[in-house]
Amino acid sequence: LPKWLDKVEDTSFKYSGISWWRAPLQWTATTNAKYYGKYIRSAYVIKSGDGSQTATWKIPVPEAGQYELYYHVFKDDELRWNDRLQGEYHFRVAYDSEMEDAYINLRKANEGWEQLGTYYFSADTVRVMLTDECKLRSVTADAVKIVKR
């Protein structure tokens, strides 16, 4: 039977065009010139919600020590056009047997790398979760990194 079936080529795109005023209901990969990336500047975007949807990064820690944790901030047009609008991203940082909350105030943050905090990580994997809980219309999961102190 398989030899009689036509091979169907997957022509779907990995990235979708999105608009911040009508954000997708599930995490959707998209591109933007202000996202982090060397060749492809991409991120995931979702409509703001109650915090039940998360984007998770798993970061390998090469050796135990103090690390600074950074998130790459992207500010969409919603913040640029409305000066009174406030919004912050809610992160959960899981390492060893700890779970800590971290926040970035998007009104005060600069675009680009913004520090989430300083942590002592053992040589293992750190999980950083960004929730969809936000007062803005959408949440953008761009990039995270750790830098040893």
Give the positions of each predicted feature.
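Extracytoplasmic
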Residues: 1-149
